[in-house]
Amino acid sequence: MMLKSITESFATAIHGLKVGHLTDRVIQRSKRMILDTLGAGFLGTTTEVFHIASQYSKIYSSNISSTVWGQPDIRLPPTYAAFVNGVAIHSMDFDDTWHPATHPSGAVLPVLTALAEALPRSPKFSGLDLLLAFNVGIEVQGRLLHFAKEANDMPKRFHPPSVVGTLGSAAAASKFLGLSSTKCREALAIAVSHAGAPMANAATQTKPLHIGNAAKHGIEAAFLAMLGLQGNKQVLDLEAGFGAFYANYSPKVLPSIASYSWLLDQQDVAFKRFPAHLSTHWVADAAASVRKHLVAERALLPTDYIKRIVLRIPNVQYVNRPFPVSEHEARHSFQYVACAMLLDGGITVPSFHECQINRPQVRELLSKVELEYPPDNLPSFNILYCEISVTLKDGATFTDRSDTFYGHWRKPLSQEDLEEKFRANASKMLSWDTVESLIKIVKNLEDLEDCSVLTTLLKGPSPPEVASNSPACNNSITNLS
């Protein structure tokens, strides 16, 4: 018997995996990912980058349309609904993170909500249909990342969601559309030609477009494959194919369907407690511990008493921003997150408003920060740590270290805290009743007979009293909501 190519084995898995292959752990973990992603998306609709992306997308029209989450007055063609919802999800860097490093959910979920609403089907798409396609999209991303040692570390060249996310999106769309194994293979080949975005756009308004484009291009790849477009049949096997994105690419054939095991069963995701790059969560935890030695819990930090702040972190240049000037730079700044936590005792959504970033006390603390890169502190979300030392002018030094923050896969958020995060995020755009209904539906998603129940709730409406995009600025972070 002729051995399958790597590309063919992926197509076989995408086409052949069934609801019965889903394990209870995979179902439970993916429902948490879906809830968290929806919340990040609703909150993201308050951002400037979402507004720009949605205004751009309104120039397109179609006979079929899908919901833009939390925006009852905006309907777009499915590809553009997926695009703007993907942009919203990543607009504050508040979405989930996996290992090897990527944001897995943001490129996949918008595809499925857009298709579930726009495409006629009898019987209707069920919650199990959505869960299966979602997990196929997540699985494809994880398998591809495991083919390159480079992917274990934080990226230096390509932003992973723009690479593996595009193929995960295409896989999820292909599964949802019921494409044949041959068409699934073509969709992957087409998606590879849409993949890739440079890390140079990290900490800018353009970075969220990486997730939106991955979602959009994945749908396009599946539709084009369905219509007969063909690509290289070994695109995942070749150095000049998907291997172009990784210097040490070494792909392997996927397990057979009969003995298939999901990567999500083995490796959970991390959920963020505040909207910033995942690596800054270690810094925040270490800074919070040091702060307890300096002042009482709710007391103001006397910044003039501090002589020196040393951060011992992995050497990740795109999160090394000594004096951030925008919210996106602050979200990618070890220095800013450490200083904000020392000063305020907490990091929240308003921590990244420019009026908070530019406070004189923050700039004073930033000027006292030094970075050290211990050789054992590697730039991998699975093994990195952060140590912070604060030296006072009287010579006293206080040091603490974080090896695992709350929300990391080794110390996962409780279901209660995950739901509270969703409530805080989604309530910016939705009524309380709608928020609670969404929590209930996602919790029981495998029992949902018709996904239109879910997509109807995603529309809104947006209560006027919570629809403001720009809360008034105040130098006291506790006065911001």
UniProtKB/Swiss-Prot annotation:
It catalyses: cis-aconitate + H(+) = itaconate + CO2. Induction: Up-regulated after lipopolysaccharide (LPS) stimulation. Up-regulated in LPS-tolerized macrophage by LPS. Up-regulated in peripheral blood mononuclear cells (PBMC) of patient after acute sepsis. Its main location: mitochondrion. It is an enzyme of class 4 (lyase). It is found in: Mitochondrion. Its EC number is 4.1.1.6. The keyword Mitochondrion applies. Expressed in LPS-tolerized macrophages (at protein level). Expressed in peripheral blood mononuclear cells (PBMCs), microglia and macrophage cells. GO terms for biological process: cellular response to interferon-beta; cellular response to interleukin-1; cellular response to lipopolysaccharide; cellular response to molecule of bacterial origin; cellular response to progesterone stimulus; cellular response to tumor necrosis factor; cellular response to type II interferon; defense response. Residues 467-481 have a biased composition (Polar residues). Optimum pH is 7.0. Residues 462-481 are annotated as: Disordered. GO terms for cellular component: mitochondrion. Keywords: Antimicrobial, Immunity, Inflammatory response, Innate immunity, Lyase, Mitochondrion. Changing K272A: Abolished cis-aconitate decarboxylase activity. One of its GO terms (molecular function) is protein homodimerization activity. Cis-aconitate decarboxylase that catalyzes production of itaconate and is involved in the inhibition of the inflammatory response. Acts as a negative regulator of the Toll-like receptors (TLRs)-mediated inflammatory innate response by stimulating the tumor necrosis factor alpha-induced protein TNFAIP3 expression via reactive oxygen species (ROS) in LPS-tolerized macrophages. Belongs to the PrpD family. PANTHER family: 2-METHYLCITRATE DEHYDRATASE-RELATED, CIS-ACONITATE DECARBOXYLASE. Homodimer. This is Cis-aconitate decarboxylase. The lineage of its organism: Eukaryota, Metazoa, Chordata, Craniata, Vertebrata.
